[in-house]
């Protein structure tokens, strides 16, 4: 069992019905989790009002599980240098950053057929965006590494080249103390074959000294703390150790 979950969304994100803060805290206690991080999306400074609402509601729950309140922040898809959509990160316990949208295009692909860019052009933009993203020391965790890649290009053709990019990203992540997330939801976006290959991304991270951290990316209470896909990855890695929440968020015990 992994006794924490550092990527959970609430109903305030608009696509997680039933994920009240009270329901999240109740589920965390039912699962016996020691710590969770609630990490809804923020896009502008005004979104911190939502974060403070979540923080107040979590405090009112008075559950046994430690609740950190952070945010998932996207890169700005209007640019290709990895800058975030907002730099207003103060006061967030856990900053997860990643990208869901194709750089310079801004769409959310469900498969390569949705990517209007030529694959080679996408790979160039994906590389510059990823490397810029992990050059930002304000970030604690790189969200779901490779998920956009899997949705935008044919992995059979481009995965080996992507591993070379991940090597560069891992070196920068280690330098800036940015963990890589073992994301359970990503497994549902991959074929069975690629679920079995995904560990290779994290092997690159470990080789560079990058911390690994777990997050379910839950949008319903039942998904919290689940790690079926994550266990497929972990059993193939040379070490099963995950970083503790305090390590990733750079907190003192």
Q: Which residues are covered by each model-predicted region?
A:
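An N-terminally biased module of ancient metal coordination in phosphate/nucleic-acid-related enzymes
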Residues: 1-80, 87, 151-164, 168, ...
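Intrinsically disordered, low-complexity N-terminal regions enriched in serine/proline/glycine
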Residues: 3, 107, 226-228
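Domain-core and long-helix interface of multi-subunit machines
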Residues: 9-15, 97-208
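Short acidic/polar active-site loop segments enriched in Thr and Asp
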Residues: 34, 93, 140
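Active-site gating/metal-coordination segments in enzymes
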Residues: 61-63, 68, 73, 77-117
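Structural recognition of alpha->loop->beta junctions
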Residues: 88-94, 137, 200-213, 228-248
């Amino acid at each position: 069992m992994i006794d924490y979950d550092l990527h959970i969304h609430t109903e305030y994100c608009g696509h997680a019905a039933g994920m009240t803060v009270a329901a999240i805290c109740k589920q965390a206690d039912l699962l016996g989790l020691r710590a969770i991080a609630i990490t809804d999306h923020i896009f502008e400074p005004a979104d911190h009002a939502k974060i403070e609402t979540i923080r107040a509601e979590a405090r009112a729950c008075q559950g046994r599980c430690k609740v950190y309140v952070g945010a998932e922040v996207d890169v700005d898809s209007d640019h290709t240098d990895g800058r975030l959509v907002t730099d207003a990160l103060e006061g967030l316990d856990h900053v997860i950053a990643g990208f869901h949208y194709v750089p310079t295009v801004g769409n959310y692909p469900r498969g390569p057929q949705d990517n209007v860019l030529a694959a080679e052009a996408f790979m160039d933009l994906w590389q510059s965006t990823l490397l810029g993203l992990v050059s930002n020391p304000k970030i604690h965790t790189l969200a779901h590494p490779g998920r956009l890649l899997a949705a935008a290009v044919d992995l059979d053709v481009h995965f080996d080249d992507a591993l070379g990019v991940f090597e560069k990203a891992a070196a920068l992540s280690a330098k800036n103390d940015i963990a890589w997330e073992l994301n359970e939801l990503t497994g549902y976006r991959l074929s069975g074959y690629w679920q079995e290959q995904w560990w290779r991304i994290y092997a690159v991270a470990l080789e560079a000294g990058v911390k690994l951290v777990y997050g379910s990316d839950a949008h319903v209470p039942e998904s919290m703390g689940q790690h079926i896909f994550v266990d497929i990855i972990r059993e193939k890695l040379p070490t099963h150790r995950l970083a503790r929440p305090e390590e990733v968020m750079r907190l003192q015990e």
